[in-house]
Amino acid sequence: NKGCATCSIGIACLVDGPIPDFECAGATGLGLWG
């Protein structure tokens, strides 16, 4: 998913679409936040 690439940025993922990118945000978030 190209959205996943955007997820790497962080906030951009949520702004673009928190629902479809939530999975990516969660995976990337765990690495960044945890």
Swiss-Prot record:
Cross-link (2-cysteinyl-D-allo-threonine (Cys-Thr)): 7-28
Cyclopeptide (Asn-Gly) crosslink location in chain: 1-34
InterPro entries in the record: Subtilosin_A (IPR021539)
Gene Ontology CC: one annotated term: extracellular region
Position(s), cross-link 2-cysteinyl-L-phenylalanine (Cys-Phe): 13-22
Residue ranges that the Swiss-Prot or TrEMBL entry lists as coiled coil: none
Location within or outside the cell: Secreted
Keywords: Antibiotic, Antimicrobial, Bacteriocin, D-amino acid, Secreted, Thioether bond
Broad class of the protein's primary localization: secreted
Post-translational note: Alpha-amino of Asn-1 is covalently linked with the carboxyl of Gly-34 to form a cyclopeptide. Thioether cross-links are formed between cysteines and the alpha-carbons of other amino acids, Cys-7 to Thr-28 and Cys-13 to Phe-22. In forming this cross-link, Thr-28 is converted to D-amino acid.
Domain of life: Bacteria
GO biological-process terms attached to the record: defense response to bacterium; killing of cells of another organism
Function: Has bactericidal activity against some Gram-positive bacteria.
Family the entry assigns: Belongs to the bacteriocin class V family.
Protein name: Subtilosin-A
